Amino acid sequence: MPDLDVGDGNIIHWEQHGNPQGKPALVVHGGPGSGAGEFWLRRFDLDRYRVILFDQRGCGRSRPHAADPATGMRHNTTWHLVADMEKLREHLRIPAWLLHGGSWGSTLILAYAQQHPSRVTEIVLAAVTMTRRADIDWLYRGVGRFFPAEWDRFRSLVDGDDVVGGYARLMESPDPAVRDKAELEWCTWEDTVMSGTHYRDRPPRARTGFVRICTHYFSHAAWLEEGVLLRHAHRLAGIPGVLIHGRLDLGSPLQAAWELHQAWPGSELIVTDAGHVIAEDVVRAALDRF
């Protein structure tokens, strides 16, 4: 399958499926660090769509992989990923494309679309998050009020109040036993809060890369000026957007999707009775509109 050299010693893996002459759509996976998967394809009518999947830096089949302790993380930030997406579009000679993703993927889509609005035809987001400091604090602290025993276990591994930063430091430890313990506890917490994810069941390499990238991004507030994606939502005016969010999503409360909908002229908000994982038929119905 194809790879693309995006600079800084990074090569991202990408692939395309469906109709080569169809409507181009880029899938932006979550995590950060989850990697793409062919399950995304079930959301698309592959007779109509040309679907491009790619693994963001450090995960999936992209190289170097964050599971390798020797892999540096300095060139793995939100803005590096935005630039990678644009390089991929140029490489594929696609004038503009639909963007689809969820959770962290929605943050990255918003960052890209606000930088390159003329390159985006439509946006379909599921489980919307803007990765603000308040969003990160809620996911790794605030929501603990619903899971007090699990939260106590999660935070007990680090000293002080900076839980996410503490885990990021543990994941950079030279001691593999320390890294393994941090990885297990992080994934246990994710599985507690994010219903239907099962991070602990992933292959060890994928799991390690996921936790290292997550802690790296979230300990740096994703290199986003606080609230910038909401403040710049007006840049999306004229781009049809569908926001799909579960009312029962404890990890990413509905408020963020509502605020984005209010700030994005012409967007539509669909609220389901789901948690963080949105039913595929709901997402497919939204994608079928375009």
Where are these regions (language model features)?
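Catalytic histidine neighborhood in serine/cysteine hydrolases
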Residues: 257, 261-277
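Conserved HGGG/HGGXW glycine-rich cap/lid loop of the alpha/beta-hydrolase fold
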Residues: 8-65, 71
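A catalytic-pocket lid/entrance helix-loop region that shapes and gates access to the active site
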Residues: 118-166
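Conserved alpha/beta-hydrolase "acid-adjacent" motif
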Residues: 250-256
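Conserved acidic catalytic loop of the alpha/beta-hydrolase fold
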Residues: 79-97
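Short beta-strand/loop motif that positions the catalytic acidic residue
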Residues: 236-237, 243-245
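Catalytic histidine-centered segment of alpha/beta-hydrolase-like enzymes
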Residues: 251, 272-285
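Conserved hydrolase catalytic core segment
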Residues: 95-134
